[in-house]
């Protein structure tokens, strides 16, 4: 899953469980990878609620078609300071799965935590 993700912090901070079923993030990697523009109090609140993530989402094949998924209007919010999915990868997604509009935010991976009102305003405008 991380192939072609040069610049992503994920490779250095993720821990796959012994049974291969879940991924956790090393505690010292959580803020720089996902919440770099959040204050420490917000990150502490988030960390109290994080749980291991299933690896199934990364292993399960997905089948799409241009007639079905390709016909759904899409928008994308580029997060320029994202350390989980580097900007070049986000731009690749937009190029290969056209989105209109593409909104660029100078935020980390998680604008829903660092700039929730601004993000909500963008989403409301899209609706």
Protein language model features and the residues they cover:
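Flexible "cap/lid" loop of the alpha/beta hydrolase fold
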Residues: 1-27, 57-63, 85
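Short secondary-structure boundary/capping segments
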Residues: 22, 65-68, 91-94
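Helix-loop "lid/cap" segments that line or gate small-molecule binding pockets
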Residues: 28-37
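Active-site nucleophile elbow and catalytic-triad environment of alpha/beta-hydrolase enzymes
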Residues: 48-68
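Short beta-strand/loop motif that positions the catalytic acidic residue
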Residues: 69-70, 75-78
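Conserved loop-alpha-helix segment in the C-terminal half of the alpha/beta-hydrolase fold
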Residues: 80-106, 113, 125-126
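Short, amphipathic alpha-helical "lid/cap" segments that border enzyme active or binding sites
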Residues: 116-124
